[in-house]
């Protein structure tokens, strides 16, 4: 398949707006379309709803992806290239305790006003100080934000921070300073004004969130004119809605439904790499996990590859460490413990548990896909 000529392809919208899913299903109305053609209006049945139009009053990965089409960051993480790419900033420099961002010229907000460095400084200070903001912590170490000219932003930090782009730039969206000063912060009445390829048309709490194409977008014009984001919490209801034509796209497909939907003649399933990680926390403060040998035995006793193959039908992959390849800090040289129950028993015996031991396994049933089945396998 070829990529759309528009600035944001349909696949990229799905990737950003439905992060961490096991898969996506596209309805009959979209399945036969090429990348050069699409519907004017696309309905997304999503497991997560938009409960507020406050752009900083959330910390959800999927909502970050949705908002990015209305209000944009200085830079974003391109997971295909595994590197940061400029969006509102065309370049930047790291100078110890100073970060200098050079804004892209000619960028306008959806109301026609130009983007300047003052909008960037205002938005970041708003994230840092607004009482409803859930994005304050990334700016705790920011000392000052300077705007020497309309297209330059200088951010001073207490100490050098190599993770600054990850924590304080990625997913930190820029709003219009003038619009906030004019309309106030009742975003339910006056939605945020951004520079993105779409603008907010309407919103219902935990209902429909409608965004429409910004015809004056500074970048390449996307081909889809309007997206309707509808919350459908139940997995089965999303699948039924897709097959009934009530939606064009669904996310978080139940694992057991993937093979059936893949065989469906009028549905296309797209699998995208997710960031959801299944792990078991072994607290080394409490017994028996304070013993390194017991922790090692636990790692040797779980056949992770079998879990992916038999429970998730191959829809996943086994990690060698605590983070995946798309996360800062990933070490490709780290190797996981192999499945070796004999080794696990030997380690337990050395730790003083020759006959094994009983431990409690806590989890929240239904919170993650197939979580009960995974825990049953681990417990056995």
Where are these regions (language model features)?
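N-terminal lobe/hinge region of extracytoplasmic solute-binding protein
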Residues: 45-96, 125, 193-195
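Ligand-site clamp/hinge motif
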Residues: 100, 214-260, 379
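Gly/Pro-rich hinge or "lid" segments in bacterial periplasmic/extracellular proteins
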Residues: 78-83, 169-222, 226, 236, ...
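Append "and occasionally in soluble cytosolic enzymes with long acidic Gly/Pro-rich linkers
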Residues: 213, 290-380
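N-terminal secretory signal peptides
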Residues: 1-12, 35
């Amino acid at each position: 398949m070829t990529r759309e000529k528009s600035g944001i392809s349909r696949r990229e919208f799905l990737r950003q707006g439905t992060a961490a899913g096991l898969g996506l299903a596209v309805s009959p109305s979209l399945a036969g379309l090429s990348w050069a053609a699409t519907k004017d209006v696309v309905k997304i049945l999503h497991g997560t709803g938009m409960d507020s139009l406050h752009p900083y009053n959330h910390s959800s990965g999927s909502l970050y992806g949705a908002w990015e089409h209305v209000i944009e960051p200085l830079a974003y993480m391109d997971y295909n290239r595994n590197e940061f790419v400029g969006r509102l900033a065309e370049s930047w420099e790291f100078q110890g305790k100073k970060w200098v961002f050079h804004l892209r010229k000619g960028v306008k907000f959806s109301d026609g006003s130009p983007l300047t460095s003052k909008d960037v400084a205002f938005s970041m200070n708003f994230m840092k100080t607004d009482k409803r903001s859930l994005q304050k912590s990334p700016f705790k170490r920011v000392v000052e934000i300077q705007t020497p000219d309309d297209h330059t932003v200088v951010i001073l930090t207490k100490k050098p921070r190599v993770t600054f782009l990850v924590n304080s730039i990625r997913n930190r969206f820029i709003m219009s300073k003038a619009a906030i000063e004019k309309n106030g912060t009742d975003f339910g009445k006056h939605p945020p004004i951004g520079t993105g390829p779409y603008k907010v048309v309407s919103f219902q709490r935990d209902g429909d969130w409608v965004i429409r194409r910004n015809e004056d977008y500074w970048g390449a014009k996307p081909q889809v004119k309007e997206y309707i984001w509808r919350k459908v919490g139940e997995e089965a209801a999303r699948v039924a809605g897709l097959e009934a034509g009530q939606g064009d796209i669904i996310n978080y497909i139940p694992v057991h439904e993937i093979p059936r939907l893949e065989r469906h003649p009028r549905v296309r399933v797209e699998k995208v790499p997710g960031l959801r990680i299944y792990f078991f926390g072994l607290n080394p403060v409490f017994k028996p996990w304070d013993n390194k040998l017991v922790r090692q035995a636990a790692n040797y006793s779980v056949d992770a590859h079998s879990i992916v193959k038999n429970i998730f039908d191959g829809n996943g992959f086994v990690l060698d460490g605590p983070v995946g390849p798309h996360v800062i800090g990933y070490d490709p040289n780290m190797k996981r413990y192999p499945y070796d129950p004999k080794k696990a028993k030997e380690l337990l015996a050395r730790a003083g548990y020759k006959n094994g031991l009983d431990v409690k396994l806590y989890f929240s049933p239904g919170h993650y896909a197939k979580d009960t089945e995974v825990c049953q396998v681990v417990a056995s």
